[in-house]
């Protein structure tokens, strides 16, 4: 206001008439963002914020979807440390192409499609490096919106909460399909198949390739085959989000079985891949989006459009994480070490599942905890109610999302007894 008054006075002395609209604009600048309300907290990231603010020495965080060792500490894999050493002193800091590192993409495709995939050899796959799995999902959602504008996406109930945000912001209409059965704490297979059957022909479906987040419930191999056959009959498009390859069984090839089944049955699919979990490269944001096409010509066209979508979004992906992945996967010794380390992480989680279940049973819990060991991957869908989760937080300083999802990576030999006792206390009267 003072600046505006000074300009007005100076203009008046010179016989000039200032443009009132211009100064009205100056007066309103401070109110441009008055209508902006605080965004709701992310249901997952907000858990960690609350955990960090809690001064209690007994606090336990089983909400974060990141691997921790048995001391509750973040882990940098040895294969990653060695790759870092080899890259140290690199003078290459140039932009990557819009499609990212071709070497990293090629190596990544082999993990999903197979080392000897005919689709790779025949150049039928359009693939680009992305900003981890989230970026791959978002890029595909934008691609779907642009090139199948009247389509919608079917998303499982429940799913990773950000899936809904991704397709919503891409302005792709959403529908849901049955997945989890709350009473059996397993797969609601018949309802899932009914939803797939009743969806309009040629619908898009989001599928979790393995280690379903948040339930830890995956279809059996035979169920995947039935799903694939029904998709084929209905001409549906399957988009696989594979964020946890290796974390389900400890074997990345085995965890890609759902994808291989769909490929065997002749589907043209899309895949989101990420190295956040299975290489611990959370902050490096390394991922890949691939779309299997009819022929090489179509693959070239699709890739060019994916790059066109990426250009105004983030232009080109980051370099360092892609270099780490390439260094590990192209070296037989480092790749072998990585596979061993993936199995160690998966086995620790499997072991904690067994210990948690046994601890609850030894406490005399009236409930069945069989689902804790039946579910697989990083998460356990505990069956705890939002009210029980609130009690765990307020009375025992245990933090998790209110849907009862326990990150088994946050469970250690040091806190599993405390966690089991707290769960028993809030559920024993159920």
Curated annotation (Swiss-Prot):
InterPro entries, A to Z: Aminotransferase_I/II_large, Asp_trans, NHTrfase_class1_PyrdxlP-BS, PyrdxlP-dep_Trfase, PyrdxlP-dep_Trfase_major, PyrdxlP-dep_Trfase_small
GO biological process: 2-oxoglutarate metabolic process; aspartate metabolic process; biosynthetic process; glutamate metabolic process
GO molecular function, one term: pyridoxal phosphate binding
Class of the enzyme per the UniProt entry, highest EC level: transferase
Keyword Lipid biosynthesis: no
The enzyme's E.C. designation: 2.6.1.1
One Pfam family hit: Aminotran_1_2
GO cellular component annotations of the record: cytosol; mitochondrial matrix; mitochondrion; peroxisome
Keywords, sorted A to Z: Aminotransferase, Mitochondrion, Pyridoxal phosphate, Transferase, Transit peptide
N6-(pyridoxal phosphate)lysine PTM sites in chain numbering: 277
Compartments, as annotated in UniProt: Mitochondrion matrix
Binding site for L-aspartate: 65, 160, 213, 405
Transit peptide, start-end: 1-28
SUPFAM superfamilies per record: PLP-dependent transferases (SSF53383)
Cofactor: pyridoxal 5'-phosphate
Catalytic activity: L-aspartate + 2-oxoglutarate = oxaloacetate + L-glutamate
Additional facts recorded: In eukaryotes there are cytoplasmic, mitochondrial and chloroplastic isozymes.
Known role: Amino acid aminotransferase important for the metabolism of amino acids and Krebs-cycle related organic acids. No activity with D-Asp or D-Ala as amino donors. In plants, it is involved in nitrogen metabolism and in aspects of carbon and energy metabolism.
Sequence similarity: Belongs to the class-I pyridoxal-phosphate-dependent aminotransferase family.
Subunit details: Homodimer.
Name of the protein in question: Aspartate aminotransferase, mitochondrial
Species, as recorded: Arabidopsis thaliana (Mouse-ear cress)
Lineage of the species this protein comes from: Eukaryota, Viridiplantae, Streptophyta, Embryophyta, Tracheophyta
Gene: ASP1
